[in-house]
């Protein structure tokens, strides 16, 4: 829209044009009161993105305050581009997770690709070199042609961006449920390494210092992307394809290297990614955090399209752009560095002392707004909360143990379920070995990367079983954190901290807001008990399509520290003759389980219980045993229960088997009782291990016959399956489903 065609201030108010930008009548009245006048078109556009849920967290701020954010190792908590945790020796790990859900539903390749690009920029804007990317993905049932298309394109987008930029994509999770049919979830996590002295903040300090724009030119892609991400999906969402950004990983690679070089210069005062809301959020947030203001001349903004208006320039979410604040008089040093990488670096403004964002275009001031009103003073809503009727019903519903007539066939069917099946089809498209630091590749409980020049390594994972959260958000929230920590411990690492991605439906619906509140309560309690503070994250609400919400899906990203690479552990059995233990009791808990979905086609009932004190005790004991050199392999028991955990432990290049004896009914093989592990131990270490891990029960032995044999204590054979048969079912499921015609 040309400046001449933009509506007047009076038109904006009288015709309520602000509503099209997601601004309510009450919010418009607040804006008018703050300014003491009517906003113009550029100004209301700026307010609309800064006050969107995506940027302001106006519906979720009261919830986020519940999370523990401090800890002995925490160097930077929520509020910056990414959180930072000390790992000793003057080093720190930087990590964060973010969503790109709505864009990926409309334009899956670019939506996923730019999600990866954005989270990488958040990490290197802190001064860290990104070392790994993970992702947590949710789709509808893989029998749907539309879902197959979204799945293939999202994975291709992640691979296309990550592989080109040279950062390994090392892990994550993919789950499939009907509720994600119209609203897939694409959450990307990035992990980086930094020395303490290189930590940078996104702050515009120093009156008179230069504001510099670096990176790609600004186009019209992604305008109102932040607003789009704060709405429900509908049949009309397809029309908002222009709100999806377009990425260039080769440009990002150059930008990454240039920024890491600039960070070494003391001429750099502050740096921030132009992410959601682009130039608007980066300038307003950097000024607000520093207690300063910013003036910019928009005529100087590098543009790849002609005739762009101030509104378009400020709201564009074109990718691969950063905003820097440089010491006055030292601009050329920075320009020279970016020039070396063939990147533009342009002085576009300066820092002021009056806490105002002033924008000039063609010699005229086109916006004058208080930065704190934009960045810190968005309205905060305490939404009404209501217990859903379905939850009350589930509490009263008895869930009978499913009848398992043939345990072997049931196991094979479970291994073919897309949520359980091997994700090799996915990660084979990712370059997970680039930079050669990946020690444990995708396919185990957590990915592990060594830290060069030390004996240390980092373990990383993403986790969330949304079915449990649907049944009981508070219990499910606890389980999400506990399972992430379990996966970290099974790799030989001590859990350090959490980054969370809260994916929920429309918070204006009281039943949905109740889910958000309860899930946050569960996550907070688990983080407190397990000593894993929340150092940052993302909130993605309005994940609904045509009025139907996704399951509550607060994805937990977690990083752990391995002090000595000799302690690195994987889930695969290592040698015939090793003893197999299960840590933890098994109860008939099938609500929300893969077996329940397989046999009944739906999930219902009371979520599996979790005792966080027991969870912590078992994790500590297992980690101590691993660090003492007593454990050959460790695998957490999750979807599909002990049966699936045993199958996954025998499926490895060594083609080992396992002979196991269990108590109870065959269905218990597939119960999803929490806080359990499958562990293998050398016979020489039996006494020491049992002394250390009190909750461990000896259930069998690793064998060389490539057979998984499971029998009852009375000697009744439940399962006798060749490892090759299990592997074929597990590895072949997703490729087979993708080839099939619906």
Curated annotation (Swiss-Prot):
Protein name according to UniProt: Phosphoribosylformylglycinamidine synthase subunit PurL
One Pfam entry name: AIRS
Keywords: ATP-binding, Cytoplasm, Ligase, Magnesium, Metal-binding, Nucleotide-binding, Purine biosynthesis
Compartmental location: Cytoplasm
Organism: Bacillus licheniformis (strain ATCC 14580 / DSM 13 / JCM 2505 / CCUG 7422 / NBRC 12200 / NCIMB 9375 / NCTC 10341 / NRRL NRS-1264 / Gibson 46)
Residues the entry annotates as binding Mg(2+) 1: 98, 538
Gene that this polypeptide is encoded by: purL
Binding site for substrate: 99-102, 121, 245, 317-319, 540
Catalytic function, reaction form: N(2)-formyl-N(1)-(5-phospho-beta-D-ribosyl)glycinamide + L-glutamine + ATP + H2O = 2-formamido-N(1)-(5-O-phospho-beta-D-ribosyl)acetamidine + L-glutamate + ADP + phosphate + H(+)
